[in-house]
Amino acid sequence: MAGHSKWSQIKRSKAVVDAKRGAVFTRLAREISVAARSGGDPNGNFQLRTAINKAKAARMPAANIERAIAKGSGHDQHGACQLEAIRYEGYGPGGVAVLIEALTDNRNRTAADLRLTFNKHGGKLGESGCVAYLFEQRSEVYLSAQSAQDGGKVSEDALLENLLELEADGYQLIDDGGAVVYGPFQALEGLQAGLRDQGWIIEGWEHCWRPLTTISQADQKSEDQCLQLLDALDELDDVHHISSNLES
């Protein structure tokens, strides 16, 4: 019985991992399909090229990637993709601003799911434009510690020297030894290409909404409520990316 119990536990654990991987693949496929609406050739479509690279980094099967491209470009048997990218905005506990990027084939369903989640966790889904002015669109490039020559972590001096040659306006060293490089919205492709040419190993890159300023909560309970809201929103199938001005 002990062996059976252990095997059951392993199967349950594997099922959880498989479910999480499946959810990631679903989100990535949606992102690829939406990007492919502007053209199915990644060589001439930076958004699609970025989405494909993210999918490959997550070890998404090539067949899944091809199906998502075909769906978005209208080359599969079901015709063009009906997904659309929509931005939603709202407030969390304590007035924290929340900006959500969703990929959906049903606006009403997505809005209802978001409203229910906000209400359940002490927040409120707002009108378009209610918090967007508190954020700006930015470029972020993630560097691997594997590209470093300084004991397994990115050398700050070497990075700073290299960034002077690129259209970067900031960076942050992270705990795993890597780094994040920041730049203007339009600089994303040039940043990742320039850093790669300089010998850095690129783990990923993306456009993100980042808060102009952050706010802190009055107590730990309020902060925990905000984090629970953000986690619950992130679990929704249609949610692609979440940004907030909660101080981390």
Swiss-Prot record:
InterPro entries: Integrase-like_N, TACO1_YebC-like_2nd/3rd_dom, TACO1_YebC_N, Transcrip_reg_TACO1-like, Transcrip_reg_TACO1-like_dom3, YebC-like
Any one of the GO CC terms: cytosol
GO MF annotation: an example: DNA binding
Highest rank taxon of the organism: Bacteria
GO terms, biological process: regulation of DNA-templated transcription
Originating organism: Prochlorococcus marinus (strain MIT 9303)
Record-given protein name: Probable transcriptional regulatory protein P9303_05381
Keywords from the named record: Cytoplasm, DNA-binding, Transcription, Transcription regulation
NCBIfam families in alphabetical order: PRK00110.1, PRK12378.1, YebC/PmpR family DNA-binding transcriptional regulator
Localization per Swiss-Prot or TrEMBL: Cytoplasm
Family under the similarity heading: Belongs to the TACO1 family.
